[in-house]
Amino acid sequence: MNPHPYLTLVRLGRRRLRSYADYLLFQRHQARMLSEYLEQHGVSLHGREVLDLGSGLGGYTMEWKALGGHVFALDLATSSPAIKAGRIPFVQANAHSLPFVDSTFDVVFCASLIEHVRGPELLLGEVYRVLRSGGICYLSFPPFYSFRGGHEFSPFHYLGERLALRLAQRDRDVPDWLRNHYEIRSSAQSFAETYDGWGLYRVTIRQARRLLKQTGFKVRHFGTRFLPVNLAAVPILGEILAWHVHMILETDA
C-alpha cells in the first residue's frame, strides 16, 4: 500500500476549513483515492454517464469530470461556485424524486447523503430507478454509533440529541466562507431539524444492508473508507469501530 495518498489526505484534511479552495483540494484528493478504489473493483468513470447525488460544494463533481465522466450534479441547495465554473450540468432537486427518466446513468455517487434524508428507502429506490442495467452506485456514510456518526455533533451525539445540539452550538467555530452553506438552526430540537430542508438521521450498517436487499441492489464490495482493514465487517462492533462505511452496489444486468 502506497502511504503517500494517505499522508496527503491527512495534510489536506487539517487545512480543509481554511478556505473554499482548500476544501475543494481536500474533496478532489478524496475523489482521486475513491476512483482508484473503484478501478480496483472494475469500475471506470471514463466515458460513463455519472450522477453526483448530493454534490454539495462540488469538489467530487469536478474530479469525476476530470476523470472523463459525463457528469450531472444534483443537490437540494443551489449550485456551488465550482460546479458553475466547471460548466457542469446541475439541477436543484430533492433526492426522493429525481427529475430523470428511468435508466439514465451508468454510475451514481451517493457519498455521505443517505444519513441526511428522511426515508432512505425512497432515496435508494430512486437511485436504482435511474441506473441502467448493470449500473453502479457508490454509497457511503458514517454509521451513527461510530465516533464520526454524529457529524459536527460528534462525540456529543452519544449523549442524546438535545444535549448534543447545545454542546455543538457552544463549541462550534464555523469559518465565514462555510457558514452560508451549512448553518445550524438555533431553534433545532433534534438532528432532523438541524438545517434548512435536511438534517441528520440515524443510519446503521445493519439498516443499510436490509434496505439495499429490499431495493434489489447487489453488493459488489463493502469496506471501511480509506482504511486497509475492514472494521465495518466486524459483527456488531463494526457499527462503532468503522468511522465511515462505503459500498459498491450494482443493479441487475
Segments and roles (model prediction):
Residues L98-F100, V117:
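Helix-loop segment at the mouth of the active site in Rossmann-fold oxidoreductases
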